[in-house]
Amino acid sequence: MAKIKIGINGFGRIGRLVARVALQRDDVELVAVNDPFISVEYMTYMFKYDSVHGQWKHHELKAKDDKTLLFGEKPVTVFGIRNPEEIPWGEAGADYVVESTGVFTDKDKAAAHLKGGAKKVIISAPSKDAPMFVVGVNEKEYKSDLTVVSNASCTTNCLAPLAKVINDRFGIVEGLMTTVHSMTATQKTVDGPSAKDWRGGRAASFNIIPSSTGAAKAVGKVLPALNGKLTGMAFRVPTVDVSVVDLTVRLEKEATYDEIKAAIKEESEGKLKGIPGHTEDDVVSTDFIGDNRSSIFDAKAGIALSKNFVKLVSWYDNEMGYSTRVVDLIKHIASVE
């Protein structure tokens, strides 16, 4: 099978990590990157040095000229174009474009990439109107006539596989989710203006910040059986990567906590292996930096109040796990074409 050729629009946290994932795989080929706000030299620096995931050590990396990055001998075309419809993805051979600016999350805005020759667009964020897919949960619902899709959010990618296992095995009556979420690039280093979210304008490295998240409700979009049964909120905390979901649910069928643990372990070692995970170790957040699984269930951290009411805890590297799923979704889409 020929390599799947991808382009990336927006070379921020997710864009750079999708590039790292793609460059280490044999089934995909990174052929182009677009970012109008940084030079090729700065792009090289930002890709090579990463405070969380460490220095890039897989290929020698250098700027060949102002329009080309070299990863070893492999050239990657670089554009610096603001308007998505003007980016010549087709000329660069990029069939699948990852829209990771965080700006063009609507279906119509993301579809502008198609005008430049892209065949499919994958939005690396939740979308209000593009169909959302979570690998390991509902990617098999994808149909080849869809040209713009969303990979949902990192938190939905953690929550949905866990919720699917619990709902399939025991049934979920209703539930509440809290994600304790590492800070992200949109937060403030010190207190600053944030008109739409006053708390979100407070210093990220100095506060625990209550925040909204649509991740739990979005599970209802990828798992219609749970539509209206889950909602949730977030606490943004002063860690730079790795987050954790606390899912508290009321079950239809009675189950002991040991039975729930066994069910999750079985699924994580079965056909979904590599997407959900399972641990019985005494872990903390930094133990999951660089983990490319979507959701790692922490068997020791959860508790049960009764056989119908339980709290389940699952970790995720909100950067690397999510970026890996973006590439996995592209691979699945290509297999359906």
UniProtKB/Swiss-Prot annotation:
Residues binding D-glyceraldehyde 3-phosphate, per UniProt: S153, C154, T155, T184, T213, G214, R236
Q: In which pathway does it act?
A: Carbohydrate degradation; glycolysis; pyruvate from D-glyceraldehyde 3-phosphate: step 1/5
Which cell locations does it reside in? Cytoplasm
Q: What is its main location?
A: cytoplasm
- Which residues are NAD(+)-binding? R13, I14, D35, R82, N318
- On the tree of life, the source organism's domain of life is Eukaryota
Please give the GO cellular component terms listed in this UniProt entry: cytosol
Catalytic center residues: C154
Tell me the subunit arrangement: Homotetramer.
Query: Which PANTHER family is this protein grouped with?
Result: GLYCERALDEHYDE 3-PHOSPHATE DEHYDROGENASE (PTHR10836), GLYCERALDEHYDE-3-PHOSPHATE DEHYDROGENASE (PTHR10836:SF93)
Mention any additional remark: Plants contain two types of GAPDH: cytosolic forms which participate in glycolysis and chloroplast forms which participate in photosynthesis. All the forms are encoded by distinct genes.
UniProt xrefs under NCBIfam families? GAPDH-I
- What is the name of this protein? Glyceraldehyde-3-phosphate dehydrogenase, cytosolic
Q: Which organism is it from?
A: Petunia hybrida (Petunia)
